[in-house]
Amino acid sequence: MSIETLVEEIGGLTLTDAAALVKALEEKFGVSAAPAMVAGVAAAAPAAAAAEEQTEFDVVLTAAGDSKINVIKVVRAITGLGLKEAKDLVDGAPKAVKEAVSKEDAEKIVKELKDAGASVELK
């Protein structure tokens, strides 16, 4: 039996039959279909190292505050969006205003938005 034929046969199984097949294969070969937890831990380590060396940041608007109009003006200036798009972004907070910007640029954007009265996060 070719692999393609086997795949076609397995594809035709009902969910109950497929679950029974998985269980039978687990018992026959002494394995588990559950994902290995070790892989998750190993993947977390590079992510932690990357966080230490982060060079690109996302500026996230969490709330417009009391000066919504001023925040919309600043968002328009930063993003180049039209009035409606900038208003929708501000109304839809929390939303990313700028993504993957340098730390220096991100800090400038955060300062501008905070000066306008917005609540902002740097991620």
Swiss-Prot record:
Q: Which UniProt keywords apply?
A: Ribonucleoprotein, Ribosomal protein
Record GO terms (molecular function): mRNA binding; structural constituent of ribosome
UniProt xrefs under CDD domains: Ribosomal_L7_L12
GO cellular component terms, semicolon-separated: cytoplasm; ribonucleoprotein complex; ribosome
State the Gene Ontology BP annotations.
translation
Cite the SUPFAM superfamilies for this sequence: ClpS-like (SSF54736), Ribosomal protein L7/12, oligomerisation (N-terminal) domain (SSF48300)
Q: Which Gene3D superfamilies match?
A: 3.30.1390.10, Single helix bin
Annotated Pfam families: Ribosomal_L12, Ribosomal_L12_N
Extract the InterPro entries matched here: Ribosomal_bL12 (IPR000206), Ribosomal_bL12_C (IPR013823), Ribosomal_bL12_C/ClpS-like (IPR014719), Ribosomal_bL12_oligo (IPR008932), Ribosomal_bL12_oligo_N_sf (IPR036235)
To which protein family does this belong?
Belongs to the bacterial ribosomal protein bL12 family.
Purpose: Forms part of the ribosomal stalk which helps the ribosome interact with GTP-bound translation factors. Is thus essential for accurate translation.
- Known partners and oligomeric status: Homodimer. Part of the ribosomal stalk of the 50S ribosomal subunit. Forms a multimeric L10(L12)X complex, where L10 forms an elongated spine to which 2 to 4 L12 dimers bind in a sequential fashion. Binds GTP-bound translation factors.
Protein name, per record:
Large ribosomal subunit protein bL12
What species does this protein belong to? Answer: Chlorobium phaeovibrioides (strain DSM 265 / 1930)
The root-end lineage is:
Bacteria, Pseudomonadati, Chlorobiota, Chlorobiia, Chlorobiales
